[in-house]
């Protein structure tokens, strides 16, 4: 994918935001939107300069490689949540052909380097049972994920599909299922 620079902040702007944030007592920063790891060199510089802060990015995972994992381990204050929407076929349908395999490789690298990471899961009317199934959760836990962010699908824009929205029964299912996953007794060893 190609990403434009029109709306990107310069390193100096990001540094200024963090510096001002620290003056206000803010020490945790999130990178979202587009693909933050197209700026991974600047993010690592920011982590180095502000080693008293924590940084977290929501990423599609396709730009995670061994060198980047080494840099993350070196700075020690940067974590990622890798977007995942189901097993290979379902994930690739929404994220692009071959993305599931790239995400699995990224997770393997994260685990190999002992890095804390998690998943970012957008659940829809089509995938909500799969992404909360024991089989799926066991897979991401086996891969090394320590946490999972769950976001419900929200159509944006004039052409956005509303068929992926959950109906009331599906929303209620998710409400209860997430609490089961979080439960101390019989729950999964992952923070959801």
Task: Give residue ranges: language-model regions.
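Canonical Radical SAM [4Fe-4S] cluster-binding loop centered on the CxxxCxxC motif
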Residues: 1-11
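A short acidic, helix-capping loop that chelates divalent metal ions and anchors anionic groups
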Residues: 2-4, 88-94, 156-162
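A C-terminal junction/extension of Radical SAM enzymes
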Residues: 153-192
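Short, conserved sequence motifs enriched in acidic/basic residues, glycine, and aromatics
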Residues: 6-8, 63, 165
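Radical SAM/AdoMet-radical enzyme domain recognition
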Residues: 11-31, 39-152
